Amino acid sequence: MRVKRESIMAGRARAAVVVGLFVLGLSFPHAQQPQVDLILSNGKIVTVDERFTIAQAVAVAGDRILAVGTNQDVSRLAGPATRRIDLRGRTVVPGLIDNHMHLLRYGTTWKYEVRWDGVETRKAALDLLRARTSHVKAGEWIYNLGGWAIEQFSDDAKPFTREELDKVAPNNPVFLQASYYEAYLNSRALQALGIDQNPGANGVVKDAAGRPTGRISEEGFRALVNKLPTAEGADLEASSLGMIKDLNRSGLTAFGSAGCEADVLPIYRRWADQGLLNIRVFCITSPGGGGNPDAVTQLLPRIAQMKLFKGDNYINHHAYGEGVYGALSDPMFRHREQTRAQDLEQWRRITMEIARHGLPLHVHTNFTETIDAFLDQIEAVDKEYPIRNLRWALAHFNQPNAAQLERMKKLGVYAAVHPWAVINGGINVRQFGDAAYDMAPLALIQNSGVTWGLGSDGSRANQILPFQTLSWAVTGKMVGGKKVLRQTISREDALIAHTRKNAYFVFQEDNLGSIQAGKLADLVVVDRDYLTVPADQIKDIQPVLTMVGGRIVYDAAAPTSTQ
């Protein structure tokens, strides 16, 4: 499929270096010139502005970008206290934004986890697990709570067994959650959770002798996750800080948080007030409830009391979501019941109230049938309370068709695309057949005129590395190299979807998403040129420096202890 380019410049013509100097305030007497704290020069600054301009240098004053332009012009702004970074030809992109992640709550388990995001072989995965055992005491839990699938292992993509995990971690209970479809446990974990004594428990897969294999199906593992120990108090803060460091290391500087738990968010607020928060959090939240008609009646007054946009550019609440009515579920792999008219009626009651109060909406919507059903209700709501300027979004969005996209365009509904195929592409093919190769149809979405952005739905349903997501969008390949997507897009349009378009989604288009004078200085210096590196190497791009609000929050050259 031929894809429209988002900007007015096409192909390599976008690589022309900007000639002028774009400065906050345009011009000013020397005495009024803000102090330039930092200049990055001799680089390839991929601004991702409306013209996809390429510059050489950028100046930062405080937490904002003061100027973008040529080396010579930007250098003139330097003062005696200005710090300089010679990029030596390296590429700089805007801080990457994920429009939908589940992370605040997962800070409670991050310290126990061995992440396999981007790991392509079973051997490498097991080596990481084995290495972890040398850093924990005997008997301590080791987790991997999602963000991977056995399909990503190019050398051996079969389920793990308890015996295999026993060899790697004989003295520690191990719990490995593969995305949201199954889990694998070693013998110590089976014993700790009482499964050896109760092999008939829900979801336990047994061998011919009736002995648990260590494999737990989706029907059973979710309940087990809730029995695992979590970090609290000071450990919770340390675990969450470790998670944020990993996000910064990946190039992420902001994310839409699907859920901002009341017991965790104050910690982030304190860090932000102290100038210590190294990532921006934009909350998708709701008052809860709404599982039956009576509960909906009780919920409606609470919607009127919701307070959005009362924070700042580090923490803010920007949308209602991601669930609306509990009886309407659209899960990844489980059997989906047919949508009932009475449930859609309750869904419409809630969304009508959301629209009446002028609130943005971000709603979990996966498959074709659900998209149709929800658009029917949204069109009915729109007749009573127009939603065009509310930035309502359908999230996940794996199976849209052209007719649905046209309806969304007329309504002004946004698409938050979360490609589960990055790790679950093989499973999608088994479950959906040929249709899986159009999940999600990026070229169709790009051509439709619907505003859309890329996210992950990490860290359990999907991996969290933005360059892995960008690689999938451009090459159509999942982790491990299997082609799982037909409708790919250009690397420019993919980057726009992971930066500028997501800034719009979280109502931060004046602050984030591009490297322009006046915007917040969220930047990522990478080890190779995103625009020219062979497409199959996009997944391997590594940030060497990440900046949030003019502060360096990750520096690959720094000692490990300070990264």
State where each predicted segment sits.
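Bacterial N-terminal signal peptides that target proteins for export
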Residues: 2-18
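Bacterial N-terminal signal peptides
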Residues: 16-27
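Divalent metal-binding segments
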Residues: 31-41, 46, 50-304, 313-370, ...
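Residue-level marker of beta-strand positions
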Residues: 91, 141, 520-523, 552
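Accessory "access/gating" subregions that flank catalytic or transport cores
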Residues: 308-310
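His/Asp/Glu-enriched, well-ordered alpha-helical/loop segment
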Residues: 352-362, 366-392, 396, 402, ...
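Ligand-binding beta-strand-loop-alpha-helix segment within the catalytic cores
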Residues: 414
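Extracellular/periplasmic ectodomains of large secreted or surface enzymes and adhesion receptors
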Residues: 555-563
